[in-house]
Amino acid sequence: MRFIPLQTEQQVSCWAAQHIINRINDFKPTAERPFVLGLPTGGTPLKTYQELIRLYQAGKVSFKHVVTFNMDEYVALPEEHPESYHSFMYNNFFNHIDILPENINILNGNTDDHNAECHRYEEKIKSYGKIHLFMGGVGVDGHIAFNEPASSLSSRTRIKTLTQDTLIANSRFFNNDVTQVPKYALTIGVGTLLDAEEVMILATGHQKALAVQAAVEGSINHLWTVSALQMHRHFLLVCDEAAQQELKVKTVKYFTELEGAVAGTDYQGK
């Protein structure tokens, strides 16, 4: 695990965006050999997308040879709905960069056969070999994508029933009306995420502190989905100060000193 303890949400966003750009540029993608990037939605990555757009406009990166796979999508919510994850991604990121439309992959929550759609998505990922970097956020209960507590830690892309906590948390995007939040979603599985070459999770705010504690100091536990990433060879957790508040002082000190020791190296994980 590599843990990046920062101070502010803006620092988290800028650090994450620069890491993505470094990975893309170091990879030197081409049409025949694209860089494959996994992406989330929600409030946490929004500023990272804004920073990526700024750096793209400054000529620091091109997304022309980047293929993206999103984590999840609501079931039975029209793609044109302002709160669909299709709308979120296009409005907040894709419409502002040079990514090719055919390189964008988002689960179709309006298909008649959800199982077939999930299988198709898994096969599409496999067709590229692997996802090189998967960025994600984490829920207050430790869920990743829509892999709610007690999800199988070897799960693949599938349909999931959303918990009441998730419905309440997401109601802020639906005029605080929990009855308007879709009850089901298609989501990549924990196993799908673990297959990625590198996973970078962003956590900001005190409400994420218990999830961060579970990810860093806790045992691997299906009730805290994020804890499964302890098994990943290249798991990167980037947090602001508020999200670190449940960690032991010596834990933060250890990782802070470790980052200082490896600054400027090609260190990828421990």
Curated annotation (Swiss-Prot):
Annotated GO biological process: carbohydrate metabolic process; glucosamine catabolic process; N-acetylglucosamine catabolic process; N-acetylneuraminate catabolic process
Residues the UniProt record annotates as site (Part of the allosteric site): S151, R158, K160, T161, Y254
Disulfide bonds: none
Gene Ontology MF term list: glucosamine-6-phosphate deaminase activity; identical protein binding
Active site: D72, D141, H143, E148
Superkingdom field: Bacteria
PANTHER family: GLUCOSAMINE-6-PHOSPHATE ISOMERASE
HAMAP family (alphabetical): GlcN6P_deamin
Main function: Catalyzes the reversible isomerization-deamination of glucosamine 6-phosphate (GlcN6P) to form fructose 6-phosphate (Fru6P) and ammonium ion.
Name of the molecule in the record: Glucosamine-6-phosphate deaminase
Organism: Haemophilus influenzae (strain PittEE)
Organismal lineage: Bacteria, Pseudomonadati, Pseudomonadota, Gammaproteobacteria, Pasteurellales
